[in-house]
Amino acid sequence: MSTRRDLPQSPYLAAVTGRKPSRVPVWFMRQAGRSLPEYRALRERYSMLAACFEPDVACEITLQPIRRYDVDAAILFSDIVVPLRAAGVDLDIVADVGPVIADPVRTAADVAAMKPLDPQAIQPVLVAASLLVAELGDVPLIGFAGAPFTLASYLVEGGPSRHHAHVKAMMLAEPASWHALMAKLTDLTIAFLVGQIDAGVDAIQVFDSWAGALSPIDYRQYVLPHSARVFAALGEHGVPMTHFGVGTAELLGAMSEAVTAGERPGRGAVVGVDWRTPLTDAAARVVPGTALQGNLDPAVVLAGWPAVERAARAVVDDGRRAVDAGAAGHIFNLGHGVLPESDPAVLADLVSLVHSL
């Protein structure tokens, strides 16, 4: 049973559920990570996967940016491939490479051999979420998972990929195997996120990091039904839900259809927008009543304060126009994760600026 808190004053929860926030809410994807010296010091003692599966460490890393910045939400420290590891997939996260899968999944037999999520294997992640709920006070906690397509991409390609050739070939040449794989990954994603919801997270975000590699036709045929099933299942639990991908301008409408498949009135459905698409354009593409999140270019943070201030003001103004055009709300974020070279002091000033506008 969920232990979610009642946080009526949260600007983040107000914006994602279509209510007027007291200020423009802001948080950053990868706000906990390599841009923080305290994170780098901790990671000298723990590998990425070890940190994800050690509750005290995951809790500490999640809290580090909350102590530094006046952000309006925390996001649980974990990794997209954690549920794959919890389903018995032999993988590692290699520095400067990313997730590497020992035995890629490329045949019907490979798909049939896949195991479901082991509930006991994700207990450390859920313990971390429970610890954070107790620590965060009035700051909401966002849980997250990778979307089925992005998990499939890692599994089929064997790691990060520029062209996603193997995954597209499987999708087009072996559609039965593809949909069987996606069905298993959808079940896994639902189980992982429901566990986080039951542990007390206040919202969830589903990252489809590689969806931008697909055409709108292929996305609708091979991905949308599975992503929609994730959100439909989560919608029964009454938490706000965000769907985010990179390079997805032409997919925003379909992605909003997925996230609103599980939306209940007043619960909140959000689509994340990267820096390539103006928020006002995104508002015209998504299902009416969907909130938007984004979308400062992460590289702008490296460009010096005058450039940061100009760009941030432009994003806030664009967000207000998007709301006027029908978006349910706007949450300020970067259009992707914080870059490792980012100066924490600049991010702190950016939060203060956004809150002042």
Swiss-Prot record:
Substrate binds at residues 30-34, 79, 154, 209, 336. Keywords: Cytoplasm, Decarboxylase, Lyase, Porphyrin biosynthesis. GO terms for biological process: heme biosynthetic process; protoporphyrinogen IX biosynthetic process. One of its GO terms (cellular component) is cytosol. SUPFAM superfamilies: UROD/MetE-like. The record marks 79 as: Transition state stabilizer. InterPro entries: UROD/MetE-like_sf, Uroporphyrinogen_deCO2ase_HemE, Uroporphyrinogen_deCOase. Pathway: Porphyrin-containing compound metabolism; protoporphyrin-IX biosynthesis; coproporphyrinogen-III from 5-aminolevulinate: step 4/4. Coiled coil: none annotated. The keyword Cytoplasm applies. PROSITE patterns: UROD_1 (PS00906), UROD_2 (PS00907). It is an enzyme of class 4 (lyase). Its EC number is 4.1.1.37. It is found in: Cytoplasm. One of its GO terms (molecular function) is uroporphyrinogen decarboxylase activity. It catalyses: uroporphyrinogen III + 4 H(+) = coproporphyrinogen III + 4 CO2. Homodimer. Was identified as a high-confidence drug target. Belongs to the uroporphyrinogen decarboxylase family. Catalyzes the decarboxylation of four acetate groups of uroporphyrinogen-III to yield coproporphyrinogen-III. This is Uroporphyrinogen decarboxylase. It comes from Mycobacterium tuberculosis (strain ATCC 25618 / H37Rv). The gene is hemE.
